[in-house]
From Swiss-Prot:
Homodimer. This is Ribonuclease 3. The gene is rnc. HAMAP family: RNase_III. Its cofactor is Mg(2+).
Amino acid sequence: MITELAAMLKERFGIVFNDPDLLAEAFTQASYVNEHQDQQLKYYERVEFLGDAVLELVVSEYLYKRYKDMPQGKLTRLRAAMVCEESFASFARECDFPQYIRLGKGEQKAHAWERDSLLCDIFESFVGALYLDQGREPVLKFVHQVIFPKLDEGRFDGVFDYKTTLQEYLQRDGDVAIDYQLIEQDGPANERSYEIAVLADGQKIGEGWGHSKKEAEQSAARQAYSQLQQK
């Protein structure tokens, strides 16, 4: 199982562990260790502790650098959405981690690999193990592959109102006329999609799509704000 995991990590993420035992530890639950006491195995809780701290740090640093004018309160809410149990469990599933977790027989029968709490732990423990094995840069590369693209995909749009955030940013030094214009709508009434552009003083600064005008406006505002922050 760990051999297959190592092969997957190499193929998908270019990650090769120097210490295979550390990788195995990150994917081993206590129930498995208890059933294999003759093998002197370790389980994931200690590296999970480290991974939790590493993830909060790298996500905090990324948000601080990317959103240079975002207030602390909004940064905190966005970070909380990115480093929560639900998000980490989702990332673990997208990485196909569940099938590689070593569980005791009882936990296997209970389908423990489906629990968000366990998948969150495994995601954190993997990052902790990667940090111990190779340091900060490989961790940054991994989260740039797995976590940060979700910002541009709109995964965390529900955390705050991008239209308000964009307005506050554009008008911080004075009045700016902000307008949202419908470019195109497509599809039948029950499946209609909308393309909307956002303009600042008549100049297009972003565009977005959605299944409602409100969703498309939020998408356009998010794209515009992200692009402005990167200038």
